Structure formats: C-alpha cells, structure tokens
C-alpha cells in the first residue's frame, strides 16, 4: 500500500522506497532515505492539506515532514 492510500491518523511501517513515476530521480529517493524514510521505519500519516490534498503531514520519530503527493507515492508501507 502506498503512503498516499493510508487514512489520516494511520500508523504504518515503511516497506520500500522506489520511484513511482519517471519524474522521480535518484536524488529524490536518496533524500527521502536521508530524511528517515527507510525500510522498517515506523511512521504516522497525521493529516492531509486542505481538501485532502497536499501536503501530507507525516511523523517519523519526533520529526514532522510535509510531503508532496509525488514524494509520498514513492513510499510503500505496511499498515499497523
């Protein structure tokens, strides 16, 4: 399941970070890894932006990230 498919407030574990479209380059995937989006890492999708759109507020540990939909679609998760 993609991070974008999780309901607001749901917790999950990162399974895989991979390019979801040709627009995604290796630099973005590397950056997501540097931010902590790594396999096995627990996270929580807190909420979406206005109208259920961007950005997605994602909590990893004690750090809150605001991700664009394109970035969030690169993160495959296992719901808890």
Go through the PLM ranges and name each one:
Residues 1-80:
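Compact, glycine-rich, soluble single-domain proteins
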